[in-house]
């Protein structure tokens, strides 16, 4: 007698009903008719476990989007590698989306308004990548009055200023910096 036992399985086919996600628990996340998901930075607060409403941190909560090394900048969409994603900021192609060893996003949430994320099947206008598209939009409204802000936490600082120049012209300046080079960390 052999020490190995053979087991045979009989297939059983079971059909499940489809599940359609119509809304999310958090405001500002919407599924669009073109298959993309919209993240509105201005309409929502940070997700649980996040310090701020960062686009890349929030995107990792969506189905099909992960990161293998727990960094913000190495996002994988539907199993593709990070270099197979197209990341745009106001139509400008970005190749590096993080700093502090990829742990922090380069996008200041105070000047980003929303992001449109395609998890495969993006429009031909986005060509050039095979995994997914993250199309981030910045502030487009002319500020009504001068305002600004500063944010500090244990790993980074960010600041922004929004100033109207006229009725139809204004400017927005934003900066974000990690503390990696202070104290010999970088």
How should these model regions be labeled?
Residues 10, 58, 78, 118, ...:
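Transmembrane beta-barrel domains of outer membrane proteins
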Residues 46-48, 92-119:
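Short acidic/polar hinge/loop motifs at secondary-structure boundaries
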Residues 143-144, 164-186:
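Periplasmic-side early beta-strands and strand-to-turn transitions of outer-membrane beta-barrels
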Residues 2-48, 56, 82:
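Short, acidic, small-residue-rich periplasmic hinge/interaction motif at the N-terminus
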Residues 47, 56-93:
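Extracytoplasmic beta-strand/coil segments of soluble accessory domains associated
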Residues 7, 62, 106-147, 160:
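A beta-strand signature from Gram-negative outer-membrane beta-barrel systems
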Residues 53, 128-130, 153-157:
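Residues that define the transmembrane beta-barrel architecture of outer-membrane proteins
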Residues 23, 148-154, 173-179:
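Transmembrane beta-barrel strands of outer-membrane/channel proteins
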């Amino acid at each position: 007698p052999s020490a190995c036992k053979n087991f045979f399985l009989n297939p059983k086919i079971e059909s499940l009903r489809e599940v359609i996600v119509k809304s999310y628990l958090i405001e500002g996340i919407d599924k669009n008719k073109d298959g993309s998901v919209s993240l509105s930075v201005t309409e929502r607060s940070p997700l649980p476990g996040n310090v701020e409403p960062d686009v890349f941190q929030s995107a990792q909560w969506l189905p099909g989007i992960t990161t293998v090394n727990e960094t913000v900048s190495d996002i994988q969409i539907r199993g593709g590698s990070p270099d197979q994603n197209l990341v745009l900021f106001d139509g400008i192609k970005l190749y590096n989306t993080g700093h502090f060893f990829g742990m922090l996003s380069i996008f200041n949430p105070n000047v980003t308004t929303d992001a449109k994320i395609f998890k495969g099947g993006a429009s031909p206008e986005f060509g050039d990548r095979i995994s997914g598209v993250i199309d981030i939009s910045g502030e487009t409204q002319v500020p009504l009055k001068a305002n600004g802000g500063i944010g500090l936490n244990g790993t980074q600082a960010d600041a922004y200023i929004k100033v109207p120049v006229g009725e139809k012209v204004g400017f927005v300046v934003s900066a974000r910096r990690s503390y990696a080079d202070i104290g010999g960390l970088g």
